Amino acid sequence: MSYQPSLRAMTAKTYGNHSRIEGGDVKGLNVLLLEDHISTGLSCLDAIRALREEGAEVTQVMSITNYAIPETMRLFEEQSIQTYDVIRFDRVVKKACEMGVINDEQAALVMEWLNTPWTWAAMHGVVAIAREN
């Protein structure tokens, strides 16, 4: 198994080949995108779009942590992207509850936010500035 590391940039460089992709040509390569964290997924999906525009095949993303917000997961499904993660946030909440860091009521509130963050924010008087992570 061989691989060629390629890094992504949020915006195209203003010099050189003006590419968002560094580390070599990705055309025709099957790319596994690695992320530290997925919240809304928008920056990750933007990177996938950039890689696909350069000819890469991207069908999988792996992250260390993932909120796994239902709306976010639907966005990945719509793009035929399978997500893998080391730790989902619901496990963090469960462990915090087990350790006594938060109680059951607090855990339920966090999980309510996690399942519908924008609706939850509106219901609790929080103004969501953007849906970007």
Enumerate the language-model features and the residues they cover.
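Short, glycine/charge-rich flexible loops or terminal/linker lids adjacent to PRPP-binding catalytic cores
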Residues: M1-L32, T40-D46
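PRPP-dependent phosphoribosyltransferase catalytic core
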Residues: R49-N133
